[in-house]
Amino acid sequence: MFWADKIAADAQINQVVNDSKTPSGRVHVGSLRGVVIHDVIDRALKHGGKSSKFLYGVDDYDALDTVPHYLDREKFAPYLGFPLCNVPSPDNSASDYAKYFMGEFLEVFEHLGVRPEVYYLRDLYRSGRLNSYIDTFLKNAHLVREAYLEVSKARRPDNWYPFQIACENCGKIATTVVS
């Protein structure tokens, strides 16, 4: 039995297949691996008579942490630490940096016949839909610190929280400390 058909046969009804990417620059062709695997699973579920929804998230609220070599460093260096959705597009073809690079990648989806429902994390954060989950994580930060220690042996300080917030003054997300 094909591996995806096995997954579909073992699955319950109403499955959500989800993948995501941080568009910090040109997306490497290797990132298509997850896209194709998730698409195959979604198709196998549907072929097997299961209800399935294929989602693809764009983590555009992650910070710009480096300027790719193919971009103008002088233009983009001032945006280091800003959420990708708040960094200008390399040209006028997109509203911002994240949409520019995701647009390139999503064009490849079309050529492959992969059609997930695409969502942007900026929209989830700004709409407040994640607020209750953020609150839960902040209230249980000690458990998240314990998980980091157990899984990756990474010790986080007691004042570390599993959340990055944009500074109200400078707009950066990478250097702001939650308190």
Model regions: which residues?
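Short, solvent-exposed turn/loop segments enriched in Gly/Ser/Thr/Pro and often Arg
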Residues: 55-64, 121
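Active-site neighborhoods of enzyme catalytic cores
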Residues: 83-179
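Alpha-helix capping and helix-loop boundary segments enriched in small/acidic/polar residues
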Residues: 29-32, 96
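Short catalytic/ligand-binding loop motif for oxyanion handling, primarily in non-cytosolic enzymes
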Residues: 25-26, 62-65, 126-129
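Acidic-and-aromatic substrate-binding clefts and catalytic sites of carbohydrate-active enzymes
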Residues: 32, 36, 125-127
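Charged, often glycine-rich, active-site loop that binds/positions anionic groups
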Residues: 61-79, 133-134
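Non-catalytic terminal extensions that flank enzyme cores
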Residues: 1-29, 40-56, 76-77, 81, ...
